[in-house]
Amino acid sequence: MDLLVLVAPLLMAQAPDLQVGRHVETVHQALISQGWQVSDAARRAEPLSARQRAIKAWVPSLITCSGTGAGLCAYGYSRQGDNLRLVSQGDGELVRWQLGDDWYGAGVASR
């Protein structure tokens, strides 16, 4: 049996290579190229403000953004039964992410 046939499902189940501080638009393009899709929750979400409409126009996985504080935004993806949620700061930098029940990231990205 071909080794790729045996290893491919394991590779698909691994967490994507995400890094605190990467811009969410860059992360979105990478996830889509890795076979992730915009989640049902993100497809159903309707932007509540002009800012959210602008974000959703370039990152369709947007679920919502907070209206106060750091302006954190949540994005949703799914792939083969796995759910991935991203959280970015208002400027679009990735802060943390959730794959299944597990959270990753170190809070606010340092420069």
Segments and roles (model prediction):
Residues 90-111:
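A short, surface-exposed interaction/processing loop segment used at functional sites
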Residues 2-12:
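Sec-dependent N-terminal signal peptides
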Residues 42, 64, 81-83, 103, ...:
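A generic structural signal for solvent-exposed, polar alpha-helical segments
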Residues 13-57, 64:
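N-terminal secretory signal peptides
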Residues 55-92:
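Functional cores of ribonucleases/endoribonucleases
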Residues 1-2, 19:
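N-terminal hydrophobic targeting signals that begin at the initiator methionine
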